[in-house]
Amino acid sequence: MATEEFIIRIPPYHYIHVLDQNSNVSHVEVGPKTYIRQDNERVLFAPMRMVTVPPRHYCTVANPVSRDAQGLVLFDVTGQVRLRHADLEIRLAQDPFPLYPGEVLEKDITPLQVVLPNTALHLKALLDFEDKDGDKVVAGDEWLLEGPGTYIPRKEVEVVEIIQATIIRQNQALRLRARKECWDRDGKERVTGEEWLVTTVGAYLPAVFEEVLDLVDAVILTEKTALHLRARRNFRDFRGVSRRTGEEWLVTVQDTEAHVPDVHEEVLGVVPITTLGPHNYCVILDPVGPDGKNQLGQKRVVKGEKSFFLQPGEQLEQGIQDVYVLSEQQGLLLRALQPLEDGEDEEKVSHQAGDRWLIRGPLEYVPSAKVEVVEERQAIPLDENEGIYVQDVKTGKVRAVIGSTYMLTQDEVLWEKELPPGVEELLNKGQDPLADRGEKDTAKSLQPLAPRNKTRVVSYRVPHNAAVQVYDYREKRARVVFGPELVSLGPEEQFTVLSLSAGRPKRPHARRALCLLLGPDFFTDVITIETADHARLQLQLAYNWHFQVNDRKDPQETAKLFSVPDFVGDACKAIASRVRGAVASVTFDDFHKNSARIIRAAVFGFETSEAKDPDGMALPRPRDQAVFPQNGLVVSSVDVQSVEPVDQRTRDALQRSVQLAIEITTNSQEAAAKHEAQRLEQEARGRLERQKILDQSEAEKARKELLELEALSMAVESTGTAKAEAESRAEAARIEGEGSVLQAKLKAQALAIETEAELQRVQKVRELELVYARAQLELGVSKAQQLAEVEVKKFKQMTEAIGPSTIRDLAVAGPEMQVKLLQSLGLKSTLITDGSTPINLFNTAFGLLGMGPEGQPLGRRVASGPSPGEGISPQSAQAPQAPGDNHVVPVLR
């Protein structure tokens, strides 16, 4: 910043730039100095400290001044310093120096860079120059300055980077790459892009044209691991084996304990050892042959005990597999993949490709590479009532094997028998046809149904007194099985499903069943009928039924049972039709009176008997059962459970008539019962009187015993009660006492705390009041003393001012004036008093008579003159009283 002062004092080691405005040339003035500025000069800035470069430091000056051989600054013809424009000058430690006009301190004072051991500076030449040894350096040359040492910077040299040495430890290698043609530190020539490894343990400082790619760790090999490698190019490995591009091989612990992958080796992974136990084997695909190449498409079976590494290109077909150890109930189904001979020398059997055969245990079997294990078979244990469906794959024939343990042969497979969905559902429900027939289907449908094994023989347990029909579609014949029995279906057999009516009234196809119950049983139906007088009624009838089978061994007889699929609906419809026809011909009153007989006759019908009426006609006799010849169903009885009119008016009329009949019957029964009761009462009364006397005697005895027991019981009870009450009261008293003591103690503590607090409060209040009262009294006493002193002083000063004679005159002036006033009035005596002074009037009479109190005339006393106490009240010398307070009583002669 320019300064306008004329005298500039320049301290030591300071400088200024002075501009000559006439010649427009600047020069430097260095202190210590007092510079007097001329009018044509201008100081460009205040004195500035010189640039001081301490030891082991440097700075960079741009546009430096030119110097001669002796180091003196050169000037041009105008007196301006000569500058090397666009040039740099690095100045090391020296005496403080000023900056000439035009010089710029481009880089401030900077410590010299110290190159530590195991480090180097990567230097690059920016300009051509000769070093201190006289060697020519061309622009673009690169070299390293290795430590330890101090780097002296040059303007022609650029520091590219600082290179650190890489520490190579045991089982490590340094991977390098040449950036251009060079010689490595071992004296080998390297071409651009070439890579190599340095395995020497220690610190390695890469050369200038060497690029560090990474630090490669050695792979530690054990007995259980191997290293899988692949060649990137043709080279010779550490064992001296020539490798071709793409070739793969393994390195195991037998080759080396720790392997550092070469730059031409690609690590594909670590291969674990494959260990086979005594009961293991494996199948190797594409095994390596004696020539070291993979035999594509070939297989090799290896059986344990053995440990090996899978060579490159080899793989296990299904991993490590267990040897097939077969027991007596196990077998293996095998298939030949290639022609082979199986068995020992004498029992060799030739198999063609695709042949299937079964081997049975007990034995250990390892399949060869030419054999495929189709499946492992187990003998299927079967009870007497269990079975399986077996199909011959060659003939296609299906048969059922029941009752013995069976193992499938090589030509047999398990066959699945399909059942209709309805039959499948009925079998999976597991309901008892007899015990669970009244339960709802939804009660068990919520439970998940276990899937049926379709290869097992379908069996069904026929309950007692029931029948199941099985139809063979191949033989086209049916068979009926009566329970209790277990029926098993053949491969071509199916159950006959019954679709029965159910509900009230009956609904068709409401229930399905596999077995037919033979009864006896009952079913209930609700039907609507109409009488001859058009009264509509609703009947609920229950029928007892059973099936009548004369010969269960006769196929035609047993087939009749299943001839009607819905025997319930068919029977209910037939019986309802008969009942409607019979009721339609009678009136409501007749049906109401004879409903059971009419319905029974309609259901069972009549049969002709030999009995005749008086007219000689045969009398019909009602039957006791109804038989349905189609299926042998027999209805043995009918129960009329309810009869309800459908019409509301008919229902009300019927209800009234029923109530009236009930009342009549009730009244007659009541009268008969009352008469019988009176008779029985008379008889019982006599017995009662006799019994009463006997009972009284017994009662007295019992009362005596009762009183004794009561007394004893009361004594025991009172003792126990008293004891319990005493204990409870004592316990209650103890608890109450403890509570009272604790409460009193707490109250006493609280009262003591309150009393102590109140006492302290009152004490402090009294102390403060006492201090206050004492202060007030002291103030009052002081005030009274001061007032008294003031009054005394005032009175003294007044008396001194007035004088004794004046005071006497003032005291006497009043009474004398009053006396003179009274004398002027002619009054002989006066009395002046107030209300508080008593007046003695006993001598008033003497005054009225003109006599004194002693009986002397007043004239004498007046003539002699009044005494000082007469005629004037003692209060006359006092101050004048207020009007009305004193009474003047004149005394007249």
UniProtKB/Swiss-Prot annotation:
Ranges for the MVP repeats: 2-56, 57-111, 112-164, 165-217, 218-272, 273-323, 324-379, 380-457, 458-520
Protein name: Major vault protein
Extent of the signal sequence: none
Major site of localization recorded for this protein: cytoplasm
Modification Phosphoserine, positions: 445
InterPro entries registered for this protein in UniProt: Band_7/SPFH_dom_sf, MVP, MVP_rep_dom, MVP_rep_sf, MVP_shoulder, Vault_2, Vault_2_sf, Vault_3
Cross-link Glycyl lysine isopeptide (Lys-Gly) (interchain with G-Cter in SUMO2) placement: 444, 704
